Amino acid sequence: MDLPLYWTALIAFLIINAMLLTASVLVYAERKISGFIQHRLGPNRVGPAGFLQPFADVVKLLFKEDIIPAQANRFIHALAPTIMVTIAMTVPALIPFARGVVIADIDVGVLAILALTSISVYGITLAGWSSNSKYSLLGGLRSSAQMISYELAMGTAVLSVILQAGSLNVSAIVEAQRDGWAILGWHVFTNPIGALIFIVTAFAETNRLPFDLPEAEQELVGGYHTEYSGMKFGMFFLAEYVNLFVASFVIATLFFGGYLVPFEPLLLKAFPALEGSVLLGLLQFLSLLAKTCFFAFLYIWVRWTFPRFKYNQLMTLGWKYLLPIGLANVILIALGVALFS
């Protein structure tokens, strides 16, 4: 259904603020989970159980001095973190949070998501170049090479989903996963290879361990944001955690039924009055949120348990393994659609 403009504006306002809050919650969750993995307590001083620690960190960053290197390009140096945050905040507009609840329900939604996530590499590259530092520049170059390499494999995974759904519209892709008994229509069951490739490449696209070569501390000090301080530095971290949550949203939407409630057809058969109700919309939103939180936890767990790839291993995995397997998977899915649809 088409929402009135004022409802769309209200949802957009709520989502932007929710993503800002989510970044803080994810920082807290990461610290607590890493503390658990390493047998530590994690933050436990500011607020109940340390929950307000991320907000204290934001206040600290706001009052820190904003230092710009003497030979840096001041305009681009300030523009780079802005690009990162803006792109990260834009992608959720294309994700349906419940049936009919989406800010921008466009026919080429999947392509728009891929395009927006691709643009974020400009922020990292510009940050590396504008800082006039060899460490920052190397981090920017690494990021460009990494994201270009893994976007191809990610594209093959998305293409296989498009072939299955027969549409580029994100809502249509979610609804296509209603086919099949209970949860067996989800693309993770009908296209497991594509799901695995997309999850792996999503780790690389968000520059998280084991794919965090652009900001490898042991090699590049801080990578592309070595010369950033104050709130500009904080904006990079805000973008990183928003991207983490957005990537989890996209994984859940394309391969795990999105807002579809598990066993939804059986639920509607037992309670027909739920069809089109606000309660069903709330259940769908909570279903999407639960799936997203699971993948956000997976991101954090992998970061604190897996070692970093070497650069040659990173490139080999992308070009020699994921891309050929992804292309073969597209061919198999295309044959399956042609023969059995």
From Swiss-Prot:
Membrane topology, as annotated: Multi-pass membrane protein
Top-level class of the enzyme under EC nomenclature: translocase
Database matches in Pfam families: NADHdh
Sorted UniProt keywords: Cell inner membrane, Cell membrane, Membrane, NAD, Quinone, Translocase, Transmembrane, Transmembrane helix
Lineage: superkingdom: Bacteria
Gene Ontology CC terms, in alphabetical order: plasma membrane
Disulfide linkage: none
NAD among keywords: yes
GO biological process: aerobic respiration
Coiled coil: none
InterPro entries: NADH_UbQ_OxRdtase_su1/FPO, NADH_UbQ_OxRdtase_su1_CS
Gene Ontology terms, MF aspect: NADH dehydrogenase activity; oxidoreductase activity, acting on NAD(P)H, quinone or similar compound as acceptor; quinone binding
Location of this chain's protein in the cell: Cell inner membrane
Signal peptide residue numbers: none
Enzyme Commission code(s) on record: 7.1.1.-
Bilayer-crossing regions: 9-29, 75-95, 108-128, 154-174, 180-200, 244-264, 278-298, 321-341
Reaction catalysed by this enzyme: a quinone + NADH + 5 H(+)(in) = a quinol + NAD(+) + 4 H(+)(out)
Subunit structure: NDH-1 is composed of 14 different subunits. Subunits Nqo7-14 constitute the membrane sector of the complex.
PANTHER family reported in the protein's UniProt record: NADH DEHYDROGENASE SUBUNIT 1 (PTHR11432), NADH-UBIQUINONE OXIDOREDUCTASE CHAIN 1 (PTHR11432:SF3)
Protein role: NDH-1 shuttles electrons from NADH, via FMN and iron-sulfur (Fe-S) centers, to quinones in the respiratory chain. The immediate electron acceptor for the enzyme in this species is believed to be menaquinone. Couples the redox reaction to proton translocation (for every two electrons transferred, four hydrogen ions are translocated across the cytoplasmic membrane), and thus conserves the redox energy in a proton gradient.
Similarity comment: Belongs to the complex I subunit 1 family.
Protein name stated in the entry: NADH-quinone oxidoreductase subunit 8
Organism (species): Rhodothermus marinus (Rhodothermus obamensis)
Taxonomic lineage: Bacteria, Pseudomonadati, Rhodothermota, Rhodothermia, Rhodothermales
GN (gene name): nqo8
